[in-house]
């Protein structure tokens, strides 16, 4: 049984949207580098120099003898660094990087990124750029199947997204807690609906709401659980959620991210599951990579956030992690 509770628009109205990166080109057709700065916080951090950096660009053939052939559009999350440089200065150095891209495979397909030239302004992000980093291919590339293996590839930076970390603490919930299930508990999740504003040309955006596509994603917050074997009612859980005083914002962590701040009283069990933190960040890159890629450059606006209450462990379902073929019986065997 699923119960849905709508949050009031005022709880995300201030910072519930992200500005677009409008593509403009040079006379030869090359994209003009741009930087976008987002601040989803409330500004209570004393040091304002911490920021999250996310690069967008083209994966193309690294051929010095001829014009590069673009293969796919990709991203490179650099993570958090501390810098007093201007965004335009950081963008200029990023466009001068020589980032090598390699396509590999493990449990799934992955992309490897590493940079060759020395760094100056981007030194706070040297660990990712110099040592190299590996990402699931679908998280950072819109068409990994088009990237060849027999031709050297490079990542040419075109856009930069900076998210200022002005809140006093940004925290990601431990992954184990996101998968934690408990009998006789009520799972508290959020269903977020975004409206995507499409660019139809330089400086032009479709603003007619009837023509705009929508994207939804769901995040797991935690579980309401009683000490006894009884289960909380949906009305009781809704009351607890209202007392939390949740405020929502959109940021650019990993592309697009949902930022949540509790300004009220939080259920003790739920608070413990969240690491006793009241400022949370859920990157869409980890939650649902398809809409995240769609939103890399688009303007998006939050139009609805709903609390979803579901049984923590549905009794009618079993959860299987792996399915293999049993050679002895010639049948599928579930482990």
From Swiss-Prot:
Pfam families: Matrix_Paramyxo_C (PF23765), Matrix_Paramyxo_N (PF00661). Belongs to the morbillivirus/respirovirus/rubulavirus M protein family. Homodimer. Dimerization is critical for virion formation. Interacts with host ANP32B. The M protein has a crucial role in virus assembly and interacts with the RNP complex as well as with the viral membrane. Associates with phosphatidylserine (PS) and phosphatidylinositol 4,5-bisphosphate (PIP2) at the plasma membrane. Interaction with PIP2 triggers matrix protein lattice polymerization. Matrix proteins induce host membrane deformation and curvature necessary for virion assembly/budding. InterPro entries: Matrix_C, Matrix_N, Matrix_Paramyxo_C, Matrix_Paramyxo_N. GO terms for cellular component: host cell plasma membrane; membrane; viral envelope. GO terms for molecular function: lipid binding; structural constituent of virion. The gene is M. It is found in: Virion; Host cell membrane. One of its GO terms (biological process) is virion assembly. Keywords: Host cell membrane, Host membrane, Host-virus interaction, Lipid-binding, Membrane, Viral envelope protein, Viral matrix protein, Virion. This is Matrix protein. Gene3D superfamilies: Viral matrix protein, C-terminal domain, Viral matrix protein, N-terminal domain. It comes from the Viruses. Its main location: virion.
